[in-house]
A protein has these predicted regions:
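Acidic catalytic/metal-coordinating carboxylates
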Residues: 51-52, 78-82
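Short amphipathic alpha-helix used as the core "switch/output" element in two-component signaling
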Residues: 58, 80-91
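Receiver (REC) domain active-site loop signature in two-component systems and cognate sites
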Residues: 74
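Non-catalytic signal-transmission and effector/linker regions of two-component phosphorelay proteins
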Residues: 1-22, 127-141
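Two-component/phosphorelay signaling modules centered on CheY-like receiver
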Residues: 30-48, 138
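Acidic, metal-coordinating helix/loop segments flanking the phosphotransfer/catalytic sites
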Residues: 49-67
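Alpha4 helix (beta4-alpha4-beta5 surface) of REC/receiver domains from two-component response regulators
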Residues: 81, 102-122, 129, 133
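Active-site residues of response regulator receiver
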Residues: 27, 71, 99
Length: 141
């Protein structure tokens, strides 16, 4: 028997297939970007990955991506710094922050008040299914 959650997920995938969301993933851990890329591409997302935030910014072009997944803690430039630089050139792209650390969303908002505009905050580990749900919700927000 198919559960209501499975039916909702199937409807989500139908909307993703129709839209073909373009996603940039930036995480210094190559295993994470590889797993997310494979999982999202299997669900009809168009995915570009970077393991270096400086390189990601240099390759970023306004309008090229619908959604960004940015790891918070990376060497060279953290996810918040990358987000601010990207927002200076494209204020329409939607972002989802990602972290493996225990800081709560509230702790980050205290340090980074601009996070009020951020609608998506994910903690590793996360399943591909949950990632897809959150990204579709973000895209439709």
């Amino acid at each position: 028997m198919v559960s209501e959650n499975d039916l909702k997920y199937d409807r989500l995938l139908t909307s993703v297939q129709a839209k073909k969301y373009r996603v940039m993933i930036v995480d210094d851990e190559q295993d994470i970007t590889t797993i997310f890329k494979m999982g999202l591409e299997n669900n009809q997302f168009i995915v570009t990955t970077f393991n270096d935030p400086v390189e990601a910014f240099s390759e970023f072009r306004p309008g090229l991506y619908d959604l960004l997944i940015l790891d918070i803690r990376m060497p060279g430039m953290n996810g918040f710094q990358l987000y601010r630089k990207i927002r200076n050139v494209d204020n329409k792209v939607k972002v989802c922050f990602l972290t493996a650390f225990d800081e709560s969303r509230g702790e980050f908002r205290t340090s980074f008040p601009f996070l009020e505009e951020v609608k998506c905050y994910l903690k590793k580990p996360i399943t591909v299914r949950d990632l897809v749900r959150r990204l579709v919700d973000l895209a439709n927000s």
